[in-house]
Amino acid sequence: MKGDRIWVGYRCDMQVTPLTGKFGADVADIDISQPLSAHELSELREAFAEYSVLAIREQDLTIDSFEAFALQLGNFGETPFITPVDGHPNVLRLLREADEAGPLFGSGWHSDWSFQDQPPSATLLYGVDIPPAGGDTAFTQQEQAYDALSDGMKELLEPLHGVHSARRSYGPSGTFGQRDDRRSMEIIGDESALETRSHPLIRTHPDTGRKSLFINEVYTIGIEELHHAEASAILNFLFEHCRRIDFTCRVRWQQGTLTMWDNRCVQHYAIDDYFGHRREMMRVTLAGETPQ
């Protein structure tokens, strides 16, 4: 289906427009505020498997319909360190006021919560209040990053495990480790952020069977089998390699856009270029599996 401009389903006419020649797509002519038919859901899943990032345009979602749509795709994932919306324990309100300074939540290339035993399979983000310009989300496709490595590098990485931790972001001395009353979001770091989890540097997607790199500069702090200096040299090369421009796409937000991405094979980066404008989003993650 990749490269097609219009994707016509068996019983639904869902328009899928690729964002690049490799991955990412805009989706139109589908209403996710109502329960999807089995055919619509199947078409959406097929597009997601093909493109890894879907920006579903012109939606009108309440918090309840947002949750209901997510639950058609899977169970909710666990969300640490951030206070959820009252009465909706799985929904985060990502808010940045127009005059708010300080670190932007979601900046830096990362895969959500890769420090968990079972990181999220996917993230869903919905635009409630969007700046007139700026605030794009950039994505980089890690299956492409893996494919572009030499056979020798693939062989070197295959048996190795990355060490993941939330310490740099949510540990006591991390970016969001201390309470800040000037911050709109209530982010509460704690000692649990110092814990580590090991996952394969190369993981296999459970649905597609495709291999991808599974590291990121925010949460990957070492390689289990290597000394620190050795691991740093390899990781720094991989961090640079992973964000090559030809592996990337960008989603330009509009009010009513829901973007969903596959955390198992995609990293993302929130771009901080809209100071002076308010931005509000709703976010959920979907439960994943232990990386293999």
Please state what every model-predicted region is.
Residues 2-258, 263-292:
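Non-heme Fe(II) oxygenase catalytic core, chiefly the N-lobe of the double-stranded beta-helix
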